[in-house]
């Protein structure tokens, strides 16, 4: 299966009629494996900060999670595995696998729980596949 198929079939799929706004699979070094059209242009230091939070959980809480210049308030996640952020009616979920970061960005009417389910399900699958 191609990386494009992972994004199209697993991240941008419909959940109860709702879809992620943007999705990406990127290497932990910040290299883009694949991203949806119009995924926010992120900066290398934003990915570095996200990786630092996986290694030192809670490090993003004081400053927020930035992705593509957008600031998200960090909310409950799973230390070392999942970071979740909220901004207004939308938010972001970042799932860490052995080699990659799975990122899903959503807006209403999608719910945080739906975003978490889509992103984390693909992340768990990729972990099982050795990624």
Curated annotation (Swiss-Prot):
GO molecular function: actin monomer binding
UniProt keyword annotations, A-Z: Actin-binding, Allergen, Cytoplasm, Cytoskeleton
UniProt family annotation: Belongs to the profilin family.
UniProt-listed InterPro entries: PFN, PFN_euk, PFN_sf, Profilin_CS
SUPFAM superfamilies assigned: Profilin (actin-binding protein)
A family per Pfam: Profilin
A GO term from the CC aspect: cytoskeleton
Subcellular location: Cytoplasm, Cytoskeleton
Subunit structure: Occurs in many kinds of cells as a complex with monomeric actin in a 1:1 ratio.
Role: Binds to actin and affects the structure of the cytoskeleton. At high concentrations, profilin prevents the polymerization of actin, whereas it enhances it at low concentrations. By binding to PIP2, it inhibits the formation of IP3 and DG.
Primary localization class, coarse: cytoplasm
PANTHER family linked to this entry: PROFILIN, PROFILIN-1
The protein, known as: Profilin-2
Keyword Secreted: no
Organism from which the protein derives: Glycine max (Soybean)
